[in-house]
């Protein structure tokens, strides 16, 4: 039996909706070897993810939507971990993924792999966007994303990010469990591949079952504009 059921369309409320982004960092978007970018380079280009992500950021900023961003950072003290990670965690630990010197000392941070992607800084560092504490493995359990959303009385989120089937999906699942309505933007995300298949396709299959909405960037932008006009 093929699952074809459709839930009622998710309706946006300007005051209760936020754009939630995950991993807006050089590690994922900057064209460098030896970084996560290599795993998703083709997927980023195929779906024009960088341009679509900026469209979402620009729209949310101009229309006054809350923007929340969950970065991925590791500090030298995280090397004290002795619990083994899975395949992707083990791999990333070996390539210096999203490494920072210290939570407070910013020496060496600017323009590093862990820094925000330069074209997005005008949105992420505008003084209004909330950059949460970092997530450590995949989801929100180690950061304050849910707290930040709750304190703004946000009920609905529009989500995007480069690691569709890993960090982004983990955030999505956590927010659904926490009681938020969630719409995923299908062409503002990327995914890596392994011998089992395509991570992007795996994410789309799961999101079709779980998310309240699965939209293109154009659809998301139009819905955000309509809700802002109606407010």
Residue map of PLM features:
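Active-site-adjacent betaalpha module
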Residues: 1-18, 27-28, 55, 59-63, ...
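Short, well-ordered beta-to-alpha junction loops that form the rim of enzyme active sites
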Residues: 70-73, 162
């Amino acid at each position: 039996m093929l699952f074809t059921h459709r839930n009622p369309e998710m309706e946006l409320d300007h005051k209760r909706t936020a754009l939630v982004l995950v991993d807006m960092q050089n590690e994922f978007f900057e064209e460098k070897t030896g970084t996560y970018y290599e795993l998703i380079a083709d997927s980023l280009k195929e779906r024009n993810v960088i341009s679509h992500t900026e469209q979402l950021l620009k729209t949310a900023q101009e229309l006054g939507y809350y923007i929340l961003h969950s970065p991925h950072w590791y500090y030298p003290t995280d090397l004290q971990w002795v619990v083994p990670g899975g395949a992707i965690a083990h791999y990333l630990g070996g390539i210096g993924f999203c490494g920072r010197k210290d939570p407070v000392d910013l020496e060496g941070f600017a323009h590093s792999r862990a820094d925000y992607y330069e074209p997005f800084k005008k949105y992420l560092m505008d003084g209004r966007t909330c950059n949460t504490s970092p997530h450590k493995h995949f989801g929100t359990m180690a950061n304050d994303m849910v707290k930040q959303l709750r304190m703004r009385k946000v009920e609905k989120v529009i989500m995007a990010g480069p690691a569709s089937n890993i960090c982004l999906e983990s955030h999505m699942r956590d927010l659904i469990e926490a009681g938020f309505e969630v719409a995923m933007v299908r062409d503002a995300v990327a995914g890596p591949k392994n011998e089992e298949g395509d991570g992007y396709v795996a994410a789309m299959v799961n999101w079709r079952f779980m998310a309240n909405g699965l939209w293109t960037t154009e659809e998301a932008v139009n819905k955000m504009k309509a809700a802002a006009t109606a407010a």
